[in-house]
Amino acid sequence: MELYLVGGAVRDLLLGRKPTEFDFAFDGSMTDFLSAHPEAVCVGKSVNVCLWHGRECMPLRGGTLASDFVARDLTINAMALDSVGRLHMHPQAVQDLRDRLLRPASPTAFTDDPTRVFRLARFAARWPNWRIDREAFVQMRAMTGQQLAVLPAERVAREMLKALAAPRPARFFRVLAQGGCLRPWFEEHERARYIPAGPRQWHANSVLGHSLRLMDELAGDAMAVWMALCHDIGKIGTDPALLPHHYGHEARGVPLALALAKRLRLPAVYARAGALAAEEHMKAGMFGTLRAGTRRDLLWRVNQLGLSEPFWKLADADSSSPVSELAYPSLEVITAVRLPEEWHNRGEESARKLREMQCVALAALRKKQAA
């Protein structure tokens, strides 16, 4: 029985990169493998997978290398390294690696597993200089909304979260848009493609185009990228008669951001961050003109949620001036305020007194900055 190193690990070795995941495949049945390796443990529920010395192993798809290669997602992942170091591959794999081309491994690659649509988009975000083969878009456009809708939310979310941390996160959504696959998981952003972000003197792009631009500016901070994706989501609910203005889009965006996070079954912090970005980004952009009480409440809320860094990064990217240069000194001032001992343990009175003192401190800071 031959055991092969397969998939992304082989690809990364050929690209001169250190593999982060190691998957193995063997050319026999599960029964044969377990007989040869009794210490292995079966762990797969829907597929035949077992753990052997901490490594995932499974039978070759279709029983042969050739059938395994065409059953994979992309040609660049359709490779295997045997126990003596011989390389086996999809006929187009090496050339596609050389050409930096993302190509489906077969004409049915995406219909065989529709999650591969999102995997392709994630690779595109990870490698912004790689091209996408025309066949990939042909297969994407042939997908139906129902084929994508039945996917487990966790699998879609996993690919998106990896893309948010990639060098060009917006490309994940651009590829999905180009292939007609934003719906149903990113329904709001499909609609955002056709809505102006605002008056021409401020925004030349659509709502989606504006959000994607900010996402790439914020690359390197995955939470800030997520918040950029959500911040203008409320604009899709603007009355067409009011366009290109979007009065009140902040409040409209909160339930939409929460619904998106729920649909993808994301951790609660993403729901809170998306809602915060939608509701408060306009205030953040006007931070220097806000009254002391409004500034205090905004700073306090963002800080209490543990989202100061990504939120103020978003505010800087979305504003014509670096508002964080005002926000962080203000945050230092209010967090340094200490409630006098006689005001301790008085419930709401204590909270009101602390807020009052923080507002006074912010007003004093503004006078000092203006002097």
Model features per residue range: what roles?
Residues 1-371:
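Catalytic cores of the polymerase beta-like nucleotidyltransferase superfamily
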